[in-house]
């Protein structure tokens, strides 16, 4: 497992945007500087929930866009087609009963042998029950 390779879940990205900064590094803290990855599917989720993000943040659109710019510059996006079918099947089996939409994030974690950064406790519990324990915990907790 590569502790310097962290896969960022959509809920983490959303929380960073709602705070108005979009700064993932600030959420991590001073304990290290892992490389941050996410599947391209995050773009779809951000677009799908953009109105909700605007309402939840209470920020002017200009500030939210500045936070989005910061967030996107801190992430390395990985095309889902780069992940093997076998890994996709494995990830789907891990996620299917909790939330199949998390499959791209878990698949990328398995593909990169990294750590998954999520604050979805229901998902974490389900993944742990299935033997997946590759989670990232920020140093700034």
Can you annotate each of these PLM segments?
Residues 19-20, 49, 129-130:
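Residue-level signal for well-ordered alpha-helical positions
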Residues 24-26, 68, 105-106, 124:
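Short amphipathic alpha-helical segments and helix-helix/interface helices
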